[in-house]
């Protein structure tokens, strides 16, 4: 398959790398010049610096011959517009829309007319909600195995002795094939993290990681502070 991805953020990058590892052809459209240059070092496919809500940019990504288009930025409005434009240019393309607002997601699932433009609607909260459910119904549960993807979703307990406690996500230096999908503080409050999110001194961190990255992720997340 040939897949065009909008957004070279944490999610877009991880999806692109996973698709390429399965033998698919990938193109990424990214507005930020530095980010576009950086991501070109990690994927073998086409990287286009530009706005995916611009018809010419989508055409440069060969959208008319693509099998799927995934709008994965953190901006709902831009994702929506890009999916509509992709469908207009290629009526047979499968569109995947990322929505950060869970309330909007249900609208896209329930309104029949919207399904013309959006084949699949996903949100980071879906993954977190599924994890919460599994935790509640399965005593002692702290990981989800994803054999088809060659990956796991795993929970790490955080306390004041952990090296990562109090640090922003962007400073953890996690491997490329991993992604923090949820952070809980000691009161159980959920945060879908960005790079600036601070790891709590007490709580849990939920991470998606490919098997090749698991050991490095565990090493980072389980490291304790050196005694003074």
UniProtKB/Swiss-Prot annotation:
Positions of NAD(+) binding: 7-11, 30, 51, 73-74, 98
**Species this protein is from:** Pyrococcus horikoshii (strain ATCC 700860 / DSM 12428 / JCM 9974 / NBRC 100139 / OT-3)
Q: Provide the RCK C-terminal domain boundaries.
A: 141-223
Question: Which domain of life does this protein belong to?
Answer: Archaea
**Is Membrane given among the entry's keywords?**
no
Q: Which GO terms describe its cellular component?
A: plasma membrane
What the protein does comes down to:
Part of a potassium transport system.
Q: Which UniProt keywords apply?
A: Ion transport, NAD, Potassium, Potassium transport, Transport
Q: What is this protein called?
A: Trk system potassium uptake protein TrkA homolog
Q: What InterPro entries does UniProt report for this protein, alphabetically?
A: K_uptake_TrkA, NAD(P)-bd_dom_sf, RCK_C, RCK_C_sf, RCK_N, Trk_Ktr_HKT_K-transport
Q: Which stretches make up the RCK N-terminal domain? A: 1-122
Could you tell me one molecular function GO term of this UniProt entry? potassium ion transmembrane transporter activity
Q: What is known of its domains?
A: The RCK N-terminal domain binds NAD and possibly other effectors. This is expected to cause a conformation change that regulates potassium transport.
């Amino acid at each position: 398959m040939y897949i065009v991805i909008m957004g070279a953020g944490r999610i877009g990058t991880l999806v692109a790398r996973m698709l390429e590892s399965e033998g698919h052809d990938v193109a990424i459209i990214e507005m930020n010049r530095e980010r576009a240059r950086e991501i070109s070092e990690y994927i073998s496919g086409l990287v286009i610096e530009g706005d995916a809500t611009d018809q010419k940019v989508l055409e440069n990504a060969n959208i008319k011959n693509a099998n799927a288009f995934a709008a994965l930025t953190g901006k709902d409005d831009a994702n929506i517009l890009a999916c509509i434009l992709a469908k207009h240019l290629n009526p047979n393309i499968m569109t995947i829309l990322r929505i950060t607002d869970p309330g909007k997601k249900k609208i896209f699932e329930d309104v029949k007319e919207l399904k013309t433009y959006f084949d699949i609607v996903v949100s980071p909260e879906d993954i977190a909600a599924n994890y919460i459910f599994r935790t509640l119904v399965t005593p002692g549960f702290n990981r989800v195995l994803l054999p088809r993807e060659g990956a796991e979703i795993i929970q790490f307990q955080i306390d004041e002795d952990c090296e990562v406690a109090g640090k922003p996500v962007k400073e953890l230096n996690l491997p490329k094939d991993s992604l923090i999908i949820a952070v809980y503080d000691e009161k159980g409050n959920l945060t879908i993290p960005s790079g600036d999110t601070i790891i709590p001194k007490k709580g849990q961190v939920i991470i998606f990681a490919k098997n090749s990255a698991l050991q490095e992720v565990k090493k980072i997340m389980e490291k304790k502070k050196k005694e003074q």
